[in-house]
Amino acid sequence: MTHRKLNRLLEGIVIGLTVPTFAFAAAGMTSSEYSAAKDRAAAEYKAAKTQCDGLKANAKDVCVAEAKAAEKKAKANAEAQYKNTEKARQDAAITAAKADYDVAKEKCDDKKGNDKDVCVKEAKAVETKAIADAKATQKVASVRADAREDKMKADYKVAMEKCDALSGAAKDSCQNAAKAKYKM
């Protein structure tokens, strides 16, 4: 496999596994569901690790690394869904990137010399990109929230200005409606 193909493969793996992390942004998880998800991840890890027992040398190491990575990602995703915050989702994406890096690094052990060095550097680059993307996603969400708030404040000021044209009870009613609508 050429370096370019390996790099594309690694990037595809990282993107494929980190993007679903953000898919559950709106859904929460109860405490019992969270506990069950962690238990399920641990059980799946044990089952996957058992399947690695028949392998030898680096193939076994890669298999175990993949099983550990799957467990780490499943637990991180469960925690992110349970906490249901941008920070938790970012942490899950970072955990996924690091787990994928560990697997990729283990796969590089089959190579020798410069090929191995290049493989490790490419794996590290993919990890770094995935972590940067996870952090950027949180920053974008924060900027969008700030923009939403700024727009709401501007709309509130317009509504209050419109209320100034009224007088008495109508003005009070208009102002109260604007305050309720824009949560000011």
Located regions from the model:
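Mitochondrial intermembrane space
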Residues: 3-6, 20, 24-184
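Bacterial N-terminal signal peptides
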Residues: 11-21
